[in-house]
């Protein structure tokens, strides 16, 4: 049982360390009042994604002590801070699409979330910009486009 726990813990740490990188691939134009704005097509805001999906442990928070309840909550605050910082670097008209794209792949498919869990994540995603003091809530569709 201990071996299984250690393997699971190592897998969590490895996946968290791997998921801490962001990548921008291409862009598309968003028509605006003064001309077109460039928005990233595929921006992986892993800090926002991990925060919204309650994947809050980070390598910096790996416990030196076995008091897991102390480092787990700190990881959530750290991820939220990094998420807000990265959202602040995005053009305001692109933020909601980027937030939606960050979680969309995790909400559907054969191994997707249960409906109530997905609804909670979507609601959190909608409220992420105001939580970061970066504008009004997003208009992300509730269950449209997801597989149940």
From Swiss-Prot:
**Chief place of localization:** membrane
Q: Matching Gene3D superfamilies, A to Z?
A: Plant lipid-transfer and hydrophobic proteins (1.10.110.10)
The lineage's top-level taxon is: Eukaryota
* A single GO molecular function term of this UniProt record: nutrient reservoir activity
List the expressing tissues.
Answer: Endosperm and aleurone layer of developing kernels. In the aleurone layer, mainly localized to starch granules and the surface of the plasma membrane, forming a uniform layer, also abundant in the intercellular space. In the endosperm, mainly localized to starch granules and the plasma membrane, but less abundant in the intercellular space. Not found in roots or coleoptiles.
Under the heading InterPro entries, the entry gives: Bifun_inhib/LTP/seed_sf (IPR036312), Bifunc_inhib/LTP/seed_store (IPR016140), Glia_glutenin (IPR001954)
List the SUPFAM superfamilies. Answer: Bifunctional inhibitor/lipid-transfer protein/seed storage 2S albumin
| Annotated localization | Membrane; Secreted, Extracellular space
**Key words, A-Z:** Antibiotic, Antimicrobial, Disulfide bond, Membrane, Plant defense, Secreted, Signal, Toxin
Q: How is it modified after translation?
A: Five disulfide bonds are present.
Q: Per the record, what is one GO cellular component?
A: extracellular region
- A biological process from GO: defense response to bacterium
Give start-end of the signal peptide. Answer: 1-19
Residue ranges the record assigns to the propeptide: 20-28, 147-148
**Keyword Lyase on this protein?**
no
Give the function comment from the record: Acts as a membranotoxin, probably through its antibacterial and antifungal activities, contributing to the defense mechanism of the plant against predators. Forms monovalent cation-selective ion channels in membranes. Has antibacterial activity against the Gram-positive bacteria S.aureus and C.michiganensis, and the Gram-negative bacteria E.coli, P.syringae pv phaseoli, A.tumefaciens and E.carotovora subsp carotovora. Acts synergistically with PINB against bacteria. Contributes to grain texture and hardness.
Protein name, per record: Puroindoline-A
Q: Which organism is it from?
A: Triticum aestivum (Wheat)
């Amino acid at each position: 049982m201990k071996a299984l726990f250690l393997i699971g813990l190592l897998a969590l740490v490895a996946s968290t360390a791997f998921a801490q990188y962001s990548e921008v691939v291409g862009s598309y134009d968003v028509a605006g009042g003064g001309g077109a704005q460039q928005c990233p097509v595929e921006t992986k805001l892993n800090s926002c994604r991990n925060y919204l999906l309650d994947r809050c442990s980070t390598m910096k928070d790996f416990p030196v002590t076995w008091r897991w309840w102390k480092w787990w909550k700190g990881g959530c605050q750290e991820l939220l801070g990094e998420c807000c910082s990265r959202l602040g670097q995005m053009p305001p008209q692109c933020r909601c699409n980027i937030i939606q794209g960050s979680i969309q792949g995790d909400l559907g498919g054969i191994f997707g979330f249960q409906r109530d869990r997905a609804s909670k994540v979507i609601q959190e995603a909608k409220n992420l910009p105001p939580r970061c003091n970066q504008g009004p809530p997003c208009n992300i569709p509730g269950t449209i486009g997801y597989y149940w």
